[in-house]
Amino acid sequence: MSPAPMPVTTAEQDRDVVVIDAVVEEVRPPRLPKSHLEDLGPVSDMFPESWEYHPDLIMEFYRKRPLQVLGRLINILFPLLRFILGIWWEKLRGKDPTVSRAKAIQLRELLTNLGPTYIKVGQALSTRPDLVPPVFLDELTTLQDQLPSFPNEVAYRFIEEELGAPAEEIYAELSPEPIAAASLGQVYKGKLKTGEAVAVKVQRPDLVRRITLDIYIMRSLSLWARRSVKRLRSDLVAITDELASRVFEEMNYYQEAINGEKFAQLYGSLPEIYVPSIYWQYTGRRVLTMEWVEGIKLTNIKAIQAQGIDATHLVEVGVQCSLRQLLEHGFFHADPHPGNLLAMADGRLAYLDFGMMSTIQPYQRYGLIEAVVHLVNRDFDSLAKDYVKLDFLKPDTDLKPIIPALGQVFGNALGASVAELNFKSITDQMSAMMYEFPFRVPAYYALIIRSMVTLEGIAIGIDPNFKVLSKAYPYIAKRLLTDQSEELRTSLKELLFKEGSFRWNRLENLLRNAKNSPGFDFDYVLNEATEFLLSDRGQFIRDRLVAELVNSIDQLGRNTWQQVSHNIQERISFLGDLGNGNGKAHQTKTIKVVPQPAIAQQEETWQHLQNLWQILKETPGFDPLKFVPVLSQIIVNPTSRRMGQQVAEGLLQKAIARVIRQWALALESQPNPAIKIRNAA
């Protein structure tokens, strides 16, 4: 059905233009990759300016418009005061309002009625256990970003203004009504003149004015709270600015298109992932045209199974893709709800809607990997330090009372089913701890929680026994064993060595998990391990290996000597008894057993080596013959020869030290001649 634009008032559009001109600094979006420039011609000339969030300009703009602020403030404060009075009344009656499900529902409904900005606020609060009690967190996670649609004629008007031509000249078809309507815009299904099926997203009218006015009010209240409320642990102004920046990015459909292209470049080549294309000719600040993807929501399990698709496998694909987003490239989809993840007929997982994206800095990515490793190994002392590095705790925080609390919250995390103990339940359990201790949730982590909790919700619906942490750890183990970054090499060192002792069980655990990670390449790991061992970066491993070899060979030599000496003494004693005619009696003597603790340690080490060999044999791509060139490389390498020299020197030093010690003991045991003379006198 071809759309027919109707004449409408331009009051909403005029208000947007005034606000944009006065509030927002205009900047040109990043240029597209060269391939797109070649395909589309002078693309940079087609693009109008886009805009960014500037809080100072917003504050200055609305300070001069007190009547607008007052009108909106009244609309916000009356329902908000009713809610606060209800909380106060609950406290007067001796009830705890923070555990009231009715109050949580009331808050969700209040935020929905206040409009787009407060829907986004509620979604942001649903990932802030440092600010919101657990019952309220549960309810806010159900907050739906859905609003009634606005008239088609307004949408068609926006299309013409943004793209420079009436909708019927651009699209051969547009659905008679929107197929979805959210807080910031609505989506139509369409078809281009060239026949491609497309999704057309159009922004709501008067959106910028409403969003900026709400941001001004929230920011003003946050500034007042920062000045007046001394016990606030979180910076409400920074949280408001972070939220506003996200909303401004979502309102700019150019930015969403750029996000989609970047996501496709990073993850679109993965074999089971699909990312739709952007039609830049038909995209503007308030209109986005992208490829239409036919698929089934992951929550529609029966329909997926009817297509012969393994829904559980698709969730695993989503988990692995999310891990790459979070921990490999640091650019991730922060809103993977069921409507944005589709099962395609060919079994691939399609990602949609790139308005809410976020980035993680390298030190944060490495910190998260370290935290997961410490969590899995129940190393809560190190986990507490990770929270300091990840900005959850200030550097001067006393960690002693926090460590046992972490153990209580995370103690059984890895072994539990996702339905019993998952990211959301961990978040719920941490909420009480965050009220008790001075935790603060960084903005980047709030979006990670939102992303992973949403993905886990889908997993639970498909398979209640799906273990997200167990599925995630093989990837973590692979990264820890193969990543060449200095941060993860240090983490590997701390994980495998403690007080000079090698922790074989942790290496076994890493290899056992890493071999189950998709894309694990045994040849690559073997070559990387050899290269690392012989490089300058592997010095600490070589030092530990030399120490282990020296100790093991020394203990073996000492035990062998003790055993030989004991046997000789037994033989001499036996022969002496025979000469005295007491051989029979000697046979009845109990042979003294020399304590040999080092032998038990050697047997334990040998058992660990056997376990490692068994794990390697079970690894895809394993072949014992692959060790031959590696061993040859190690033998002829000068570094290996130096290790041999260090082992020999270490053994010699131990032998000399032992001789000196025995000589000193012998001197101490001999009587002093001077004392004998005095005693005789």
Swiss-Prot record:
One of its GO terms (molecular function) is protein kinase activity. It comes from the Bacteria. Pfam families: ABC1. SUPFAM superfamilies: Protein kinase-like (PK-like) (SSF56112). Coiled coil: none annotated. Belongs to the protein kinase superfamily. ADCK protein kinase family. PANTHER family: CHAPERONE-ACTIVITY OF BC1 COMPLEX CABC1 -RELATED, UBIB DOMAIN CONTAINING KINASE. This is Uncharacterized protein sll0005. It comes from Synechocystis sp. (strain ATCC 27184 / PCC 6803 / Kazusa). The lineage of its organism: Bacteria, Bacillati, Cyanobacteriota, Cyanophyceae, Synechococcales.
